[in-house]
Amino acid sequence: MIEIKTICQRIYNKIYIPRYKKQMGACGERVFFSPMNSEFIYENMYVGNDVHIAYHADMVASKSKIVIGDHVVFGPHVSIRGGDHCTDVVGKLVDKVGDDMKLPENDKDVIFEGGNWIGMNSTILKGVTIGRGCIVAAGAVVNKSTPPTIVL
């Protein structure tokens, strides 16, 4: 007997996932993700083919792009940050500074060249390119770009 939870998940996947994919800047084939318990800024995500993003992903880029090549797998609780808070506006607290006040250096694209495996609880920060074939270990914080085929 199929559980009610499984039936609800299948219905959700058939109805809502295609809608979320259409909101992306680009979305390839065989892309799997869990929007119910994740945070994405869809219009700034450019996703290739054969990509799997596990639950509780946090991929945020308000003025930059997150570009994910083909054959990339993200473990659970991965955080991708395409920018920083703007902290140099005099006379305003950080929570009162909107995206319209950001400087170009506050946000930079994050790029995954393809064939990557990003471990659970890892964080990738603005301006980073993860080279083709790289593996990022669980819990890693990556703030600099990597050459191809290394393990972090």
Residue map of PLM features:
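Extended, small-residue-rich solenoid/repeat segments and analogous flexible loops
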Residues: 1-41
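C-terminal/domain-terminus segments
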Residues: 124-152
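A generic alpha-helix propensity feature with a strong bias for hydrophobic helices
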Residues: 21, 96, 150-151
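Generic structural signal for beta-strand residues in well-ordered domains
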Residues: 24, 40, 103, 143-144
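Hydrophobic transmembrane signal anchors and adjacent membrane-proximal interface regions, especially
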Residues: 2-6, 74, 113-116, 136
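Short acidic capping loops at alpha-helix termini that bridge into adjacent secondary structure
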Residues: 29, 49, 70, 114, ...
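Flexible, glycine/small-residue-enriched loop-and-beta-strand segment within the central core
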Residues: 37-46, 52-128
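Short, highly charged low-complexity linear segments
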Residues: 2-3, 12-13, 91, 110, ...
